[in-house]
C-alpha cells in the first residue's frame, strides 16, 4: 500500500509539471516566417474572447488579456505579447446594454539571430 501511495504522488507531480515543460516547445510544430524584426507563426492563429461586459472598453481589455494569457501559457512569455502579434483582427458586438469582444491574431516573438559557434 505504501508503494502505491508513492507511485500516485510521483504520477501527480509528473502530470503537474509536464505541461509546463512541453508548453515552451509547442511552438516548434508550426511553420514560422520572419516579419520585420519578428518571428511569427505562418498560419496558426489564437483567439481571445470576453464574456458579456458592461462597457466596450472592458470587453476589449478582457479579450486581449485572454489572448495573451493563453498564448503565454502555451508558448511562453516571448510569444504571448499581443502588441507583437501579426494579422490582428478585433471585433466587438453589442447585445442589449452589454458588449462582447473577440480577437484573433498570429503569435510572434522578437527576432533573434542564432550565434555561430
Give, region by region, the residue ranges found by the protein language model.
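Domain-level marker for long, solvent-exposed, non-transmembrane regions
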Residues: 21-117
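Bacterial N-terminal signal peptides that target proteins for export
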Residues: 1-9
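Bacterial N-terminal signal peptides
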Residues: 10-16
